[in-house]
Amino acid sequence: PAHFKNYIDMCDEESCHVMIKEIYEPHYERFGKYFGNTFRGFFSDEPCFANNIGSYYDTLGIPSLILPWRNYMIEMLAKRADLSAEEAELLLPGLWYEVSGKTSRLRYAYMETVTHLYRDNFSRMIGNWCRERGVLYIGHVIEDMNTHMRLGYGSGHFFRALDGQDMSGI
C-alpha cells in the first residue's frame, strides 16, 4: 500500500541503523537525563514487512507480491533449504509459483531467512540500543487475522519478532 512506500527495510541492517539514528538518537540527545526514570521505554506499534498488496491475507505464492530481498540472502536460503546456491537461485520462482516437490521447502526456508533477518536487524538492534541507554524496548507485533505468521502487515514469525523486546504491549 502507498502508506508503506517509505517504510524501513526490516531485513537490512543499514536501514535499521538509519531509523535509530534519525528517530531514537534525537530523543536520547534531548531527553537522555530522563531515560530509565521518567522514560521507562520505547514502544513500537505493529512493525511489519509492509510488502503486502493490501490484504491481511497475502501469503507467499501470489504472483504479484513483492518480497523482501537482499542478494546475500541466496546463500542463507540455500543453507536452510539444504540446496546449493545455484539450485536455490533456479528455484526462486517457487516463491510465487508451484514448483513440483520443492515449493514447501523453498518457502519455509525463505520465511526462516527473512524472519531471522527481521529479528537480528530490527528487533534485537532496537532492544540493544534501548537497554544500553537504560530503557526497555516494548512493542506490539500484530497477531490478529493470522498476520503473526505472514509478511505484509506481519513480521513473519510472531515469537521471533518478539526476540529483542523486553516486554510486549498493546
Residue locations for each model-derived region?
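Catalytic-domain carbohydrate-binding cleft regions of carbohydrate-active enzymes
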Residues: 1-170
